[in-house]
């Protein structure tokens, strides 16, 4: 089944790879295998923009040797695998091939040598779209563990190549925690950014100006954390979270991050005003992870019955909910709809996201809680 890939290329591997040898050639004879190659990342039958950097990938197992052929008509790239690093497709060759393949399909053939003999897997295809890609992907860069938690930053990766630069590094802010960054409609001239610890708070960047939105709004609203911009850019929905971290002595999930309380509120950017409504701000529930629909008329969020924390952390099961929003009157509807019931299913929802066209909604499902990154399930 085809799936569209416009914005995802693993930047993690970019610094490890170098271009493959131009001397590689397809095997003269190979036995056909009636299965697709098991590759990582899974780039089988995807759609790509014409400016994307080379889709470098590898076989999931360690092959004796491997070769990939990528072609469109008479144009072709042949690349030999560079050991565990995989197929390191040359940027120049790749760019020439994509330029000649806009609106067409690339055929990808993967060959693997086993016990001295070559075999060829079933070919797959990459559709080259004429649509352009946003030039940068912005993300938090941090080591995949907790030992170097005080070394992190917000970085940007140029998707047309492998250039990575820092937007802000925490060595400039006292090695505190930097997270929860967001842009309105991919506008690089505006961004919100949250920091914990020293200089903690939420900061609004607008056309070169920096405003600290909150040191502490009130005793009930200690901070603004997880954001979602309204499509108009006039509002930001925030969750306000009292977050704690603990370590397990004997559990497959080594780290537990949990909210002791959380609510959702609305920030009016133009009027510098915070607004709350009982439907999103209740002592009886933990509300978090707000996300506006693409038309701005619905706010999605996660909600769970409040529990005694940390004793009952495994009882916290977040449901996926929605509520109507009228940007003209700055009002929410009276009814909250439950789209996925975490309590009934025994699962927990986090990170809801709506596609730009409004047709799809994705979310993460885990066993409990809302910090699923540390959960092996």
What are these regions (language model features)?
Residues 39, 118-146, 219-220:
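Low-complexity, Pro/Ser/Thr- and charge-rich linker/hinge segments at domain boundaries
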Residues 182-184, 228, 291, 353:
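Conserved beta-strand position repeated across blades of beta-propeller domains
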Residues 185-187, 231-232, 294-295, 356-357:
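Residue-level detector of Asp-centered blade-edge/turn motifs that repeat once per structural unit
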Residues 136-214, 219-220:
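Conserved, compact domain cores that house catalytic/ligand-binding motifs in diverse enzymes
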Residues 18-19:
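C-terminal motif of bacterial Sec signal peptides marking the signal peptidase cleavage site
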Residues 137, 190-191, 233-236, 296-299, ...:
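Hydrophobic beta-strand positions that form the internal "hydrophobic ladder"
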Residues 32-42, 76-93, 160-176, 205-223, ...:
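Multi-bladed beta-propeller domains
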Residues 135-148, 238-260, 301-318, 364-377:
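Short, conserved, GDST-rich strand-edge loop motifs in beta-rich repeat architectures
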């Amino acid at each position: 089944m085809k799936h569209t890939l416009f914005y995802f290329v693993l930047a993690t591997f970019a610094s490890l790879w170098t271009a493959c040898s131009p001397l590689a050639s397809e095997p003269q004879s190979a036995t056909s295998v009636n299965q697709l190659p098991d590759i990582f990342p899974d780039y089988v039958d995807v759609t790509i923009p014409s400016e994307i950097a080379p889709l470098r990938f590898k076989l999931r197992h360690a092959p004796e040797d491997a070769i990939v052929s990528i072609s469109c008509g008479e144009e072709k790239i042949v690349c030999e695998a560079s050991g565990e690093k995989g197929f390191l497709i040359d940027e120049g060759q790749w760019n020439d091939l994509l330029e000649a393949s806009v609106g067409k399909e690339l055929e990808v053939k993967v060959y693997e040598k086993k016990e001295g003999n070559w075999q060829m897997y079933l070919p797959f295809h990459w559709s080259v779209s004429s649509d352009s890609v946003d030039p940068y992907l912005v993300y938090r860069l941090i080591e995949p563990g907790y030992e170097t938690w005080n070394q992190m930053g917000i970085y940007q990766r140029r998707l047309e190549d492998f250039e990575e630069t820092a937007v802000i590094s925490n060595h400039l802010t006292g090695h505190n925690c930097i997270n929860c960054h967001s842009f309105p409609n991919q506008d690089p001239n505006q961004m919100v950014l949250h920091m914990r610890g020293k200089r903690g708070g939420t900061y609004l960047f607008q056309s070169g100006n920096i405003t600290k939105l909150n040191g502490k709004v009130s005793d009930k609203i200690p901070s603004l954390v997880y954001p979602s911009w309204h499509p108009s850019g006039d509002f930001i929905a925030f969750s306000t979270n009292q977050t704690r971290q603990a370590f397990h002595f004997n559990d497959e999930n080594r780290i537990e991050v949990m909210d002791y309380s959380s609510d959702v509120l609305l920030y009016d950017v133009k009027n510098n005003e915070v607004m709350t409504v009982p439907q999103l701000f209740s002592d009886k529930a933990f509300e978090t992870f707000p996300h506006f629909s693409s038309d701005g008329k619905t706010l999605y969020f996660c909600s769970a019955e409040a529990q005694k924390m940390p004793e009952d952390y495994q009882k916290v099961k977040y449901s996926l909910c929605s509520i109507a929003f009228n940007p003209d009157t700055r009002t929410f509807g009276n009814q909250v709809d439950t789209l996925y019931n975490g309590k009934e299913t025994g699962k927990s929802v986090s990170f809801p996201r709506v596609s730009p066209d409004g047709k799809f909604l994705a979310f993460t499902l885990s066993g409990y809680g809302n910090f699923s990154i540390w959960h092996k399930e």
